[in-house]
Amino acid sequence: MPDRDLVIASLETPIGRMWLSGTHGGLRSIVRADEPEGVIGLADPDALSDALLQLADYFSGRLRSFDLRLDLSGVASFHAAVYRAAMEIPWGETASYGEVAAMAGSPRAARAAGRAMARCPLFPVVPCHRVIHADGSIGGWGPELWVKRWLLDHERG
């Protein structure tokens, strides 16, 4: 049975269909998939209209920074701190996993920051793609690596 507070909507993007879910507390997840496996909620694009518009503007190049409430209620506190730190990385720039860990208040937790980025349910609003290895290589990522490359290239113009 769907969570009565959870709403979903979808958007076609250059990297595929994205399914958004959210609550009154904010945007909860973004999943890139043809169908939203495991995301059950009331289909309500109006409830997620700000997120849909901002994502469309991001992919068209008109938006460089998101201004959305996020529902991080089910996220571990360290992961939430890492996500907030990643959101400070400007459009078109990158930071290492170690730098993001330090920004999140845990300078010795680069690997843990990497695991948090790999599990981030809110890309590209939380710009996990901007977090790379200290040697400048883009490293791995939860979604396919081509998506990370595409997002980095998109922001570099």
Explain the meaning of each model-derived region.
Residues 134-157:
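…primarily DNA-binding HTH/wHTH and HhH modules…
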Residues 124-131:
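Short Lys/Arg-enriched helix C-cap and helix-to-coil transition segments
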Residues 115, 130, 149-150:
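Extracytoplasmic/periplasmic beta-strand context in beta-sandwich domains
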Residues 108-123:
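Regulatory, non-catalytic segments
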Residues 1-108, 154-157:
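Basic nucleic-acid-binding alpha-helical/helix-turn surface characteristic of O6-alkylguanine DNA
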Residues 52, 117, 121, 145:
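Short amphipathic alpha-helical/adjacent loop interface patches that line ligand
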